[in-house]
Amino acid sequence: MKSSMLGRLEQLAHRLIEVDALLADPDSAGDMDRFRRLSRERAELEPVVLAFNAFQSTQADLATAQEMLADPEMKAMAEEEIKAARERIEVLEGELQVLLLPRDPNDGRSLFLEIRAGTGGDESALFSGDLLRMYSRYAESQGWRVEIMSESPSELGGYKEVIARIDGDGAYGRLKFESGAHRVQRVPATEAQGRIHTSACTVAVMPEADEMNDIVINPADLRIDTFRASGAGGQHINKTDSAVRITHLPTGLVVECQDDRSQHRNKDRAMQVLAARLKDKELRERQSKEAAERKSLVGSGDRSERIRTYNYPQGRVTDHRINLTLYKLQQILEGDLNELTGALLAEHQAEQLAALGEDI
């Protein structure tokens, strides 16, 4: 192992001891923001330090086995132990390399999920509803909370556009590679001839912005319009201008929220979504530049890129970025996404390791 890597691991082991001491301090419990920040840091440090401890322990076992070589009666056993220890050290070094890769500071955040119907008309809108259900089921399986922020329903079901907030630790890190064009191939319910139609939806996964630090929005850059909400809403609908449309003049980004009966809450929601979109815009510009430099397959930030096809007749899902095909369409649509998200994360880590090798 390189001395620079060893030094970094020793620093992290020492930092874990410091964090544990700070968490045990009664003052930390009185400051919930500080306590949460330290708890999150500890959760990030612990797997690295545990792997490092295992690495050091295996190195000690190797040294002991090498000393045993001098004893003729113990030589055969020592050689076996040396072989096993060296193999274990190689595995642990690989794990530690991955654990030390630069972390996306947004990985631990909650996210905004935006799904828009694209080509395919009503069938595309129906598929956007299927995608929302898929991600909602996955979020539930992870213990995350899903809240609809804004929706534009289609007459036949599904959505022309829907924005949801998924609230949970690590939500963005797990779902960030879902951004892009999702294509569906199936026979629509309205198709009398049984012909397969192709339609598509665009998915955007945006990390929730930290209002204090991430994005500064100048009120002078905003045009805020209020209007009467449309759609289902019972006796209160169309009686007050509760719906809000916010336009960010420098970028032309527009956010509408009308799902709540309170204008104030609709404005708050619209501002949250706008902040996330502005943060996402910055991220995508940076990712696009990095992807061009590294020829990255995953995480390029290109929303127009067709990333996945859901083929109903064949019961398959294909992710085109990593050439992965799974014949478990129904399970995936029910929220069983771990195999997909895990493969995408592994590919991203492989790209990072390759880039690290180029930089050394």
From Swiss-Prot:
Record's keyword terms, sorted: Cytoplasm, Methylation, Protein biosynthesis
Using the record for this protein, list the coiled-coil segments as residue ranges, or answer none.
none
* Residues carrying N5-methylglutamine: 235
Q: Which gene encodes it?
A: prfA
MF terms per GO, please? Answer: translation release factor activity, codon specific
Entry annotated with the keyword Repeat: no
Concerning SUPFAM superfamilies, the annotation shows: Release factor (SSF75620)
* UniProt region (Disordered), positions on chain: 284-303
InterPro entries per the record?
Answer: PCRF, Pep_chain_release_fac_I, Pep_chain_release_fac_I_sf, Prokaryotic/Mito_RF, RF-1
Q: Which Pfam families match?
A: PCRF, RF-1
What is known about what this protein does?
Peptide chain release factor 1 directs the termination of translation in response to the peptide chain termination codons UAG and UAA.
Q: Which family does it belong to?
A: Belongs to the prokaryotic/mitochondrial release factor family.
- Modification(s) after translation: Methylated by PrmC. Methylation increases the termination efficiency of RF1.
UniProt xrefs under NCBIfam families = prfA, PRK00591.1
The record's GO CC annotations read: cytoplasm
| Subcellular compartments | Cytoplasm
Q: Which domain of life is it from?
A: Bacteria
| Gene3D superfamilies, per database record | 3.30.160.20, 3.30.70.1660, 6.10.140.1950
Q: What is this protein called?
A: Peptide chain release factor 1
Question: Per its UniProt record, what SMART domains does this chain match?
Answer: PCRF
